[in-house]
Amino acid sequence: MPFITISNHPYGHIDGLILADYFGHLRTDYKIMVTQFLERVEALTPSLISVTPTGVERTAATAKSIMGVRRALTHLRSGGALGLLPAGAISDFSLRDGCVRDREWQPAIIAFMAKAQVPILPVRFLDRNSAFFYMLGLIDWRVRLLRLPAEVFNKAHCPVRLCLGPLISVEEQRQYLATHTLEEYGLWLRTYCSRV
């Protein structure tokens, strides 16, 4: 049975690795859609579908991204399982909300999920990076990025805590989309992820 996992993005690049490892033990056909950065680790390539971010404005899809999306749809249509990190970037500290939270989900990923027409499994990472990491992000995201390798290594001997939510059926999604916009659909799915 094809399905999509959706998840928050608290740690950075290792989120995709953790999901690929966890679900890869359950389903050998599980792949995760990631930015091209992880593609450089050749041992991971069979578990990845790579897309290229299009920059800060995210104005136009690149050929690599279009091919990645096509590969992902083909993978699902052939019965595969796919992992998505819809925020597309690591969680950060929101001064407005006073907490660490995912960024807004990417409209292209929301549209992809609606088009895929497969069950969706919400997954939530319960932990996050250090307070120091988020404090650096208040200075500048590039300063915070320099800290990311240390954040990966300080979790080396810590268990990763995941919660899996209820599977959201295709019928539930269709019913919701019949009376709501894609943006509302994205918020609805995001709520599932945060409640898990």
Residue positions per predicted region:
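Non-catalytic C-terminal accessory region of glycerolipid acyltransferases
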Residues: 65-196
